[in-house]
Amino acid sequence: MRFKNLLLLLLLLLLLHKEVFAMDNITVLARIIFAEAAGENYLGKVAVAWVVKNRVYSKKFPNTYENVIYQPWQFTGVNSLLWKKTFYPKKLNPRELTSWQDAQKIAKEVIEGRISDPTRGADHYYSIIIPIPKWAKKMQKTAKIGKHIFFKSEA
């Protein structure tokens, strides 16, 4: 009986304090920057970060970084090999480690508002290496940065 009560108490604590176990905003944003824009220059990485931030502050999307990034069918980088590598930074090769550190720095600066939005409010993007998605035809193009084209949903 005592074990059962302890287990229930632990479960209750987990439910009440799930943010303790959730990824912090900087880490989860850095992961998606790394996974989606590892081959991009600084501005390309900043642009990907801003799309996530724009979604967090939009009424059309979830209001947390983690929920925006994990929203189904949104970011192909989630659960990619690059995404998974960020859980084990000591195993990153020197080039990947530099890119991961850059992603962390960019994530922090974007979240803190120290870098302006180069996408002009974009909340979507796609890579130029794929055919134009149907959704892009219904949106306003805001920028082309590196290998991504950025779009803003209609208000």
Where are the predicted features?
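Initiator methionine at the very start of the polypeptide chain
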Residues: 1, 22-23
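Bacterial N-terminal signal peptides that target proteins for export
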Residues: 1-7
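Bacterial extracytoplasmic/cell-wall-associated proteins, especially those involved in peptidoglycan
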Residues: 23-155
